[in-house]
Amino acid sequence: MIKLKNIEILKYKSFTTPQSINIEEDITVLVGMNESGKTSVLECLAKTNYFEDDEKFKFNETLDYPRKELKSISKSDSKPKAIICTYHISDELIGLIENRLGKGTWQGSNEITLTSSYGDSSTLISGVSINFELFLKHLNLSDIGDDVKTELKLALTEEKFDQILKKFPDETERLEPLRKYFFKSSTWMTFIERYAYSVLIKRHLPKFIYYDEYYQLPSRIILESFLDDDVDLSDDLKTAKALLDLSEINVNELINADDFEDFIAELEATEALISDTLFQYWSANQNLNIEFKIDKKTATVKRQVNTSYGSATTVDTNIVEHVLDIRVKNSKTRVSLPLQNRSKGFNWFFSFLVWFNKIQADSNSKYILLLDEPGLNLHATAQADLLRFLESLVDKYQVIYTTHSPFMVETTKLNRVRTVFSDSDSSIVSDSIQQKDPNTLFPLQAALGYDVAQNLFISKKNLLVEGVSDLLYLTTISEYLNANKRTGLNEDITIVPTGGAE
C-alpha cells in the first residue's frame, strides 16, 4: 500500500550537500568504492523508521552530523534536518481512508513526505490533507453552526474538544462521536489530518531492517546473555536472539531444565524451515546441515562446613553458563565444524535467513530490506544464487543493497543502479551509469565485460552496440513496440555493449 519513492539526504556524515536518490519499486543497487558513502545511505534511511527500538539506529547529532559543520549548529536552537523520504500511497489505501472519513475527503496527492531531524528524532509529515466539510458531512454534522465548525477546525487536542463541548452544551450529544479522532497532544494543522496519518496511514508505513556482516551467528552462544532485557546485545547476539524467538524458546525455562531434548527439537524444526529456503538458493554444496547442542559449563567451589567431627572442606559443582553450540555437518564427508569455521559465505547466508525469517513472522508490518555489501564472502556463483533469492522477495519487499562486486550487478537491469562516489566536499549519488570516475564504474564495467564474454560464447545471435546507453535505448524501444503489438527485436538476439573505440 505504501512504497518508498525517493529519499533526499540533507546532512549526514559524508553527505554535506543534499543528494536526491530515486528508489525503485523492487530493487535499488548502490554501487561505489569503499568509503564512498554507500553505507551512510542505508544507515540514514534506517534511522527514519527502524523496525525495533535500537539506539544504534537513532539520529545522533554528535556522531552523525557532518563533523566540519558541527560547530556551526551547536549554538542553534533549531534541530537540523537529516533526510526527507517521499512515499507513494496506493489508491487502495486512499480508498480505505475515505471509507473511514468519507468519500472525497482525501485532498492530497498519492505522495506524502516525512522529514527526519536530529535531536528529539521528530518527524515532519506533509502531504496529508483532508476536506473538513466532507468529513463532517460523512458524520451527518454538516448542519452544525458555523461558530461550532470554526472552533472544531481549530481544535487540536482532546482538552480543547472538551472545552468546545462545555461552550456548546446543546451540541454535546451530536459532537461526542468526534472524541475518538482527538489526541492528548498534537502539533498538526487539524485534528482529523493527525488522525488520518497516525491511525490510518502510519501502520502501513514500511519499517526498515538493516543487515551487514556483523550480524552473523556465532558458533557458541551463552544463553545467560539474554536474561537481562536492559542489556544491549551485540549484533551477532541479536541474530542469535532471533533464532531463539523463531524457535519459541523461553531462555529461563531452558536454563532451569534438566533435559534439553525438547528445546533442541524446537531449534531443529526452525533450522529445517530455514534450510529449506537456504538450499533452494545455495547451489555450492547441498550436503550441509546445521546441528545444535546445549552444554552446561560448570565450576567447582570449595567451602568449609562444620561437622560432628570438626571443620571439613566440601566441593560444590555449580552450573555457571549454558552454551548453545551451533555446528555445520557435511553429510558426505561426515565431518562437522563450528559454524564460524565453515565458509563465511555459508554463515552469512544462513544468518541472514534467520534474521529475515524473524521479520517474516511479523505479518502485521511491512518492511524494506537494507543490505550492506550482501554476499561479500560468497563465490561468484553463490552471489548469483543470492540475486535469485532477492528477486524472489520483490513481490512483498523493497530491497536496497550496496555492493562493489560485479557479480551483484545484473546487466539487464541497469536502471536499478545508483553510483555513489565522493569528491572533496561531499558524497554524491547519481542515477547515471556513465560517471567519469573509473573506480566507481569498475563493478559495472566488469559486470558488462563478463556478460559480453558469456554472451559471445553462449548466444548464437549477438548485436554489438557501442555503449550501455545504446543497450538501454534499444531494449526500451523493443519493449514498447512489443507492448503495442508491433515487432520488436527477436528474443534470440542478445544486445552486447562493447564499450566503444575508446
Short names for language-model regions:
Residues 108-165, 196-285, 306-309, 317-321:
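Coupling/switch segment of ABC-type P-loop NTPase heads
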Residues 96-98, 174-203:
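Short linear interaction motifs
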Residues 1-51, 266, 270-280, 293-299, ...:
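Switch/communication elements of ASCE P-loop NTPase nucleotide-binding domains
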Residues 50-80, 184-194, 292, 367, ...:
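Flexible phosphate/Mg2+-sensing switch loops adjacent to catalytic phosphate-binding sites
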Residues 43-110, 255-264:
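Conserved P-loop NTP-binding catalytic core
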Residues 105-111, 124, 203, 446-464, ...:
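Acidic, Mg2+-coordinating catalytic modules of nucleic-acid enzymes
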Residues 72-79, 104-107, 116, 197-206, ...:
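A general structural signal for short secondary-structure junctions and capping/turn motifs
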Residues 19-21, 99-101, 221-237, 427-431:
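Short, polar loop/linker segments at the starts of domains and inter-domain junctions
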